Curated annotation (Swiss-Prot):
Quaternary structure (record): Part of the 50S ribosomal subunit. Forms part of the ribosomal stalk which helps the ribosome interact with GTP-bound translation factors. Forms a heptameric L10(L12)2(L12)2(L12)2 complex, where L10 forms an elongated spine to which the L12 dimers bind in a sequential fashion.
Family: Belongs to the universal ribosomal protein uL10 family.
Organism: Thermococcus gammatolerans (strain DSM 15229 / JCM 11827 / EJ3)
Identification of the protein by name: Large ribosomal subunit protein uL10
Signal peptide range: none
Origin superkingdom: Archaea
Length: 340
């Protein structure tokens, strides 16, 4: 039986203890990360997460031992994601916040031949600090729209030289470095994270926050409208439900001519308008003085306030927009409360 070094046993024990004492365990790849950026990352994580760099085999043993001791078989699956120069990142931060923190902590790095770019690389339009030379011919050979203007190399328009996932060639690395474009990123790449018997991979954690906020707002508005339209009272919708019921009852009363303190003005106004509509089609000799006065007053109001149809439509649309905005603001104000 092969002898196992004592330091390896202690390392596995220490790693196991770290894994068991934190609710979220992530694997990150530190391969290729220079010492200084790694040190800066440790400083940024201090108080938020514990970064422990070790050998892949020892990390795997520690994960399996912790899974067995905690009776959490799903934790053992985390070992399947060990690759490169893996390290353990133990934290109480949820995996989504952890992923965001790691991504925001990455810094640009110069181009290296053979490296894979994480996102599209675009050479922006405009003058550069480069003097005319052989590099211009190399750029043009690659399709980069470069030319000499006023003794300097100028890029005629934005040009994408690499798509995300493509490899940097030696020639392109030389051009990008000469232009001062840093297409690579230095930082900790999250391989996978474990929390509550679930393994999270980067493609799951890389969410568009604004998109999800919009989805939540839309879902809230639909729920709000459904609650109001089905008269299902909640803290957020009771006022709108009562207002809708009041207006509905008032309209029914007005249509039926049922007089109450709230409807008498609308009913009388409606009756007067109907009366004047009939009166204006009758011969003048059949009208009494009071009716004539009412018709004249109505005509003067119409003449005194002429308004083009287009203006009326625009104003009506503006009023509707203002009402909609106010309604949306009022509804969205309770977004957090409705969803707990």
């Amino acid at each position: 039986m092969a002898h196992v070094a004592e330091w390896k046993k202690k390392e596995v024990e220490e790693l196991t203890k770290i894994i068991k004492s934190h609710p979220v365990i992530a694997l990150v790849d530190v391969a290729g990360v220079p010492a200084y950026p790694l040190s800066k990352m440790r400083d940024k994580l201090r108080g938020k997460a514990l970064l422990r760099v070790s050998r892949n085999t020892l990390i795997e043993l520690a994960i399996k031992r912790a899974a067995q001791e905690l009776n959490k078989p799903d934790l053992e699956k985390l070992a399947d994601y060990i690759e490169g120069g893996a390290a353990i990142l133990a934290t109480e931060m949820n995996p989504f916040k952890l992923y965001k923190l790691l991504e925001e902590s990455k810094t640009p790095a110069p181009a290296k031949p053979g490296a894979v770019v994480p996102k599209d690389v675009v050479i922006p339009a405009g003058p550069t600090s480069l003097a005319p030379g052989p590099l211009v011919g190399e750029m043009q050979a690659l399709g980069i729209p470069a030319r000499i203007e006023k003794g300097k190399v100028t890029i005629q328009k934005d040009y994408t030289v690499l798509k995300a996932g493509e490899v940097i060639t030696e020639q392109l690395a030389r051009i990008l470095n000469a232009l001062g474009i840093e297409p690579l990123e230095v930082g900790l790449n999250l391989l996978a994270a474990y929390e509550d018997d679930i393994i999270y991979t980067p493609d799951v954690l890389a969410i568009d926050e604004q998109e999800y906020i919009n989805m939540l707002q839309q879902a809230y508005m639909h729920a709000f409208n459904l609650s109001v339209n089905t008269a299902y009272p909640t803290k957020q919708t009771i006022e709108a439900i009562i207002q809708k019921a009041y207006l509905g009852a008032k309209n029914v009363a007005v249509e039926a001519g049922y007089i109450t303190p709230e409807t008498v003005e609308d009913i009388l106004g409606r009756a007067i308008r109907a009366f004047l509509l009939i009166a204006q089609n009758l011969p003048e000799e059949l009208l009494d003085e009071k009716t004539k006065e009412l018709l004249n007053a109505q005509a003067q109001v119409a003449v005194a306030a002429p308004q083009p149809a287009e203006e009326k439509v625009e104003e009506a649309e503006e009023e509707e927009e203002e009402e909609e905005e106010a309604s949306e603001e009022e509804a969205l104000a309770g977004l957090g409360a409705l969803f707990g």
